[in-house]
């Protein structure tokens, strides 16, 4: 069968590449065309063709999007025309809601007009539970099946909006399970791991406070910064200059997590990775205009928590020190609470079991691929 995939950023390219590999296992005759990146190209091999690289269209923020709007619109037009010409059995949208929902709306119109016979699937639901909830009408109107990688999204879509979706498993949990599968021995040395984010601004905002908060523990714990891929070591140098006992490691995040006693983590996927390794953590995220951000979070942003761990558990498993709660003293106090002997450590480890249970043991891309091939095979018989 013919599969057309659209991924508009690096994370989408990675997730889509795993899905392509799984689809090939389920459907050895599969062929692919896609808007995506190098990972998808490698996964598809001779079975695939990249129409356009995501870096040509990956603009974030109002001003960059506005400045590059002609390029983005040309990309949409090219994508629509290519799909109409190739006539795939299905189109699989991967996150990247702004671009993908525009294309999906057009394709649904062509399907309704009898000019296209294809199924429209969405792999990795956009986070409309936090922002732009009105987009639910687009999914109901245009998408045949939604595949989610976050278990709490099922209640949001189905209970609140009466829109059935499929939770297929979580890729982060998959990766941690795969990493832990070989017999690994945890190190004996007690350690505190600092995960200050993957973007320069995040690192600049969060790392100094993380270092200052953890410094009093340097005699009892080794303190290590997990360097982000794509950020050169020189960028970190000013932060650790004259800091006794603090080191930085690159390309070893999972090794470091598998041996960590506790962690300070900037919000994002890293919070879920840390929980999957059963490492107690404090979530730290410095923001501009703290009071304003807190007000917006309480009144505009439609979710109770910022960390995936708490969202999945639907309770405060880990402390979230962001906006007006972010301070060196607060981080230090919460870190002390989750170190051995601290009053919050065991409860957090117990609560992690709820997170593991809700994530399940399904391999997300394999599960999604099985369902997609089954749905397509079934639809072609009728």
Could you tell me what each predicted segment is?
Residues 1-382:
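Nucleotide-activated sugar donor-binding and catalytic core shared by glycosyltransferases
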């Amino acid at each position: 069968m013919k599969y057309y995939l659209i991924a508009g950023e690096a994370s989408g390219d990675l997730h889509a590449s795993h899905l392509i590999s799984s689809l090939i296992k389920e459907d050895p005759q599969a062929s692919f065309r896609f808007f995506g990146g190098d990972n998808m190209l490698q996964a598809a091999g001779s079975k695939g063709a990249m129409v356009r690289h995501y870096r040509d269209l990956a603009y974030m923020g109002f001003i960059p999007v506005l400045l590059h709007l002609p390029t983005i619109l040309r990309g949409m037009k090219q994508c629509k025309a290519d799909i109409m010409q190739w006539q795939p059995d299905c189109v699989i949208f991967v996150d990247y809601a702004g671009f993908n929902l525009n294309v999906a709306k057009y394709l649904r119109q062509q399907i309704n007009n009898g000019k296209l016979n294809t199924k429209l699937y969405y792999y990795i639901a956009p986070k409309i539970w936090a922002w732009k909830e009105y987009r639910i009408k687009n999914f109901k109107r245009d998408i045949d099946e939604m595949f989610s990688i976050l278990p709490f999204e099922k209640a949001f879509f189905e209970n609140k909006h009466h829109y059935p979706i499929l939770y297929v498993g979580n890729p982060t949990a998959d990766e941690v399970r795969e990493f832990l599968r070989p017999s690994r021995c945890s190190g004996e040395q007690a350690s505190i791991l600092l995960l200050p984010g993957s973007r320069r601004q995040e690192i600049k905002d969060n790392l100094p406070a993380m270092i200052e908060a953890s410094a009093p523990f340097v005699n009892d714990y080794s303190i290590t910064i997990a360097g982000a891929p794509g950020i050169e070591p020189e960028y970190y140098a000013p932060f650790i200059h004259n800091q006794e006992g603090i080191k930085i490691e690159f390309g070893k995040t999972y090794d470091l997590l598998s041996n960590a006693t506790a962690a300070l983590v900037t919000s994002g996927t890293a919070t879920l990775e840390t929980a999957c390794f059963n490492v107690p953590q404090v979530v730290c995220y410095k923001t501009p205009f703290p009071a304003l951000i807190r007000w917006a979070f309480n009144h505009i942003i439609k979710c109770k928590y910022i960390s995936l761990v708490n969202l999945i558990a639907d309770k405060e498993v880990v402390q979230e020190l962001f906006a007006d709660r972010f301070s060196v003293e607060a981080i230090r106090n919460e870190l002390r609470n989750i170190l051995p002997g601290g009053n919050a450590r065991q409860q957090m480890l117990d609560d992690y079991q709820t997170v593991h249970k809700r994530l399940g043991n399904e391999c997300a891309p394999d599960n999604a691929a099985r369902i997609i091939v089954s749905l397509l095979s079934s639809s072609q018989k009728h």
